Amino acid sequence: MKPAHTFSLIFSLLFVINPCYSATLPLAIRRELTWGQVNILHTTDIHGWLAGHARDKRYSGDLGDFASFVQHMKHLAKQKDVDLLLVDTGDLHDGTGLSDLTDPPGSWTDSLLANMDYDILVAGNHELYLSTVANDTYHNFIPLWEGRYLAANIDIYDEHVSSFVPFGDRYAIFSTPHNVKILAFGFVNSFSGATDTVRVLPVSQFSLQPWWNDMVSNKDIDLILIPAHVPVHNASELDIVLSELRIHFPTTPIQVLGGHSHIRDYAIYDEKAVGIESGRYCETVGWVSINGIPSFKSLVKLSGISSLMGVESYLAERLRFIGESIRRSSQQIFSSLQSAKSASVSFSRSYIDWNPEGFMFHSKTKKSSFNTSLGEFISNGIYEARKALGLLTPIGCSPKKFAFSEVPFNDSNSIYHLFQSELFPKIVVNESRHHIPHYIIVNSGGIRGGLNSGAFGLDEVFQVCPFKSNIFYVLKDVPWSITKYLPQALQHSGYLIAEDTLQINTPQVSDAKFEDFYEHSIRKTYGYTTHDDLGDDGDDTAHLTTPHYEPLRFICSQVGFDDSFSGDDKQVVDVVAPSFVIPRLDDILNKIADKPLYSPDDWELYFTRPDGKHSMTDLLPLYADLYWDHDCLYK
């Protein structure tokens, strides 16, 4: 199933990569995409990053650049006489000021995304945490897609009918221009923490639902798409769905399009079922192609050689190349084509770095012709929205780069270390109880990105920590006989996954040196070097492997444990945490005590400010204002 790739070298402008690495790249080395009968561009876990990564050339494209790319690729697909679909698999919200500063959060970014020509979309868990976001998505965003926004296991309370109703369509059946009949069936991962107006239904109960029986009764399906907000590996929900579908569609090709764990990944389930996951934060565009679908029909009349890529065109070209094909009759050629149509299905995948240079390379366009009117409209809309939200105005000056995962958790250059050693002890302060030794505990998934050196604004603040609803509570006077075991117990308690923790977001990297891909003398940027079930050749751009260190599961600041603290078991300490972590902490403390001592009702508000700036998101600008120079604001 592993496709043969055509390798290509192209020259690009010299640019400086992320300042963490201080390296330059004189040449961008890119792999060509493999086209098939059905091709899919895939996005996932965008999290509001529609403006792209302006300070990182590897992922510098905005949504407007992507829109232009999609339009050019659709034109290219038409030239090649093949199908091209566009699919997104959820988590459009929570992650940037552009997304999170509007009321309701994500309403402006949803309006911009509505300009995209998506064929299928599904919800992620971040569409479902807040009732305002869920209701806005249900009432104003989902109807725009006319039955192509899928939510097999999500119900929402509709106040107009006073009952729970499907959040989106359970499934969709449609045919492509080339006569491929597709069943698309999408769902979200099982998670806790959804707003009270939303119900996430167990995937294990799908086969008991009336709509499931209606869906699987369609036997003339040529291709099954499973766009789902789940990882493509080690997801029990996906295992259940694949097993159930294979009962009814034992030989139908299945393409899974996953998400949630923020990595590039590809999985092979059986000889006709595969899955791709396409990263996060507008860093990656996934690409899959599928060949060997018998129902596929060329839109160009067969004349010895038809379309540029399909099975018919490939076989016709081979017949022309081989001498004996010249002597074959048209009937023999037709027979050969029919035989090819019954051959086994094949798949390929690529991971495209989200930048204009790569988009131009793959769409065979130039800078002068790349931007489309739609792309420029969206880019202008992003700029105006950022301007209106105050995102273009710097509010602080970072003295250096604080890395997210490129350095160890406790390194002084780590964003986690900054929060643990500086922000929590110095900003999260309750004057009436600050003298009492206390822990400040946050799940590390509450930190979602690093911070570059120099000026930063509200957009960067939300990129580091977008959880505006995370405010701090205290559990008072907990005996040291219990709390002395708490730091160790936290790290052995498992990941707190409901808030989409990023401990599972590691790119699956390899030490492959790509000797067969480029000359050793050519320099590369740091970036994704993905190893998946198809090997090491999926990344469209050759990179050096980015250093990656897993964070601890929880950030735990110990404050006030000075020489006066004796460590006697009868001493008491306070435990401070945001509301999201409280149920986990209660569970851990009760297990240490071996009895049910604590519940959420025992926690009291700890850190408040008259100006309302007391959430996790507010800590960074508050700290910067007090402890960092402001010189960059006046340059």
From Swiss-Prot:
Binding site for Zn(2+) 1: 45, 47, 91
Site (Transition state stabilizer): 126
Residues bound to substrate: 467
Residues binding Zn(2+) 2, per UniProt: 91, 125, 260
Cofactor(s) the protein needs: Zn(2+)
Superkingdom to which the source organism belongs: Eukaryota
Cellular component terms per the entry's GO annotation: cytosol; extracellular region
Keywords tagged on the record: Cytoplasm, Hydrolase, Metal-binding, Zinc
Biological process annotations from GO: adenosine metabolic process; nucleobase-containing compound catabolic process; nucleotide catabolic process
Subcellular location(s) of the protein: Cytoplasm
InterPro entries: 5'-Nucleotdase_C_sf (IPR036907), 5_nucleotidase/apyrase (IPR006179), Calcineurin-like_PHP_ApaH (IPR004843), Metallo-depent_PP-like (IPR029052), Nucleosidase_C (IPR053828), Pesterase_C1039 (IPR014485), YHR202W_N (IPR041823)
Gene3D superfamilies: 3.60.21.10, 5'-Nucleotidase, C-terminal domain
GO molecular function list: 5'-nucleotidase activity; metal ion binding
Family: Belongs to the 5'-nucleotidase family.
Name the record gives this protein: Uncharacterized protein C17G6.03
Native species: Schizosaccharomyces pombe (strain 972 / ATCC 24843)
Lineage: Eukaryota, Fungi, Dikarya, Ascomycota, Taphrinomycotina
